[in-house]
Amino acid sequence: MLRFLTAGESHGPALTAIVEGMVAGLPVTHEYINTQLARRQGGYGRGGRMKIEKDEVQFLSGIRGGYTTGSPITLQIANRDWQNWCHIMASGPDALLDERVVTRPRPGHADLPGAIKYDHSDIRNILERSSARETAARVAVGSMARCLLEELDIKLVGFVCSIGSIKASVAENLSIEDLVARTQSSQLFCPDEQAEEAMVKEIDQAKETGDSLGGVFEVRVYGVPVGLGSHVQWDRKLDSRLAGAMMGIQAIKGVEIGLGFGAAAVPGSQVHDEIYYAAQRGFYRGSNRAGGIEGGITNGEPLILRAAMKPIPTLYKPLRSVDIKNKEPYLASVERSDVCAVPAACVVGEAVVAWELAVALMEKFGGDSLGEIKARLNQWQQWVRQV
């Protein structure tokens, strides 16, 4: 069973994750993980925190000589900003709990419901954990899963489809090589240069007015074998699990797979993908409006997922709120934040998709070592070609 937990606060000493169930013999390097962490910190519209942090992973267990051992993997990412908060966020009784107290919840954040649920008079106890800073740990964990996918010839790419009112035009038949090249050269991870220019202007305008912007990103996965997931129970449907993982990313408010919500607006004849057969190829679809999943099971076509991110709740022109201490109306508190973090969310989206696919692969093929799962996947693919 492949699973993980993360721990840590935004201004605590570090973020930590423990991964259990990863196969032995998987090559994993600091450089690979750090590259993905750097991507998460990039993107136009980020805030001042990114000038402080330079995320780097440290492996504390489970990896030796650049390869996983099969033991639980402990990884840690230090928070460089900790030195500015060590007295306030200290775990001991000497913590300066009366400093930087937050009592004015931000609309759209976990602040108020979290403070009520956990009976906190200082909202900092909520916002420190609910912060998207936690996603750095999930990117590190998901990057390990991505290493496994790449060893199995499964490749994925994410890109930004829209920011605010600006939508990119991205052809469905673009190769993964073209998509990767275009997104890598874009400061917004957007493969449409003209749309990117307009997005930058809209972000600048939002910054000038103290506002924030959301958007949509897409993740495509190529080389996914037939048969991951299952139709037999709701919680084994792969589309359900992928959507849940995407919705678990901070600020994500909607997820669609394939044609998604667009399928509700057209007749079935324009939704469902017709099935064909060729001796050298086997069964295949003439289109991919299902996004690579039918009945909760992968069908061999590329996976296509999109997620909608709401604008960040922290506004430099804050909205009206109420102080939880004196119940008087105030403007919401302001924490250091981004204007737009859709590109960063895209990187997190890649990571959580990679993780869920790794879990599904382990469930389907099992194995304790990389060689074992490779052999079982190869055997399965040979059988599928004969069906």
Curated annotation (Swiss-Prot):
Q: What is its EC number?
A: 4.2.3.5
Entry note: cofactor = Reduced FMN (FMNH(2)).
Q: Where are its TM segments located?
A: none
Q: Which GO terms describe its cellular component?
A: cytosol
Q: Which EC class is the enzyme in?
A: lyase
Presence of the UniProt keyword Iron in the record: no
Q: Where NADP(+) is bound, by residue? A: R40, R46
Which keywords describe this protein according to UniProt?
A: Amino-acid biosynthesis, Aromatic amino acid biosynthesis, FAD, Flavoprotein, FMN, Lyase, NADP
GO biological process per UniProt: amino acid biosynthetic process; aromatic amino acid family biosynthetic process; chorismate biosynthetic process
One Gene Ontology molecular-function label: FMN binding
SUPFAM superfamilies xrefs: Chorismate synthase, AroC (SSF103263)
Residues recorded as binding FMN, renumbered to this chain, are R129, S130, S131, Q250, A251, G295, K310, P311, I312, P313, T314, R336
In the record, the note on similarity to other proteins reads: Belongs to the chorismate synthase family.
PANTHER family per the record?
CHORISMATE SYNTHASE
Q: How does it assemble?
A: Homotetramer.
**Purpose:** This reaction introduces a second double bond into the aromatic ring system.
UniProt protein name? Chorismate synthase
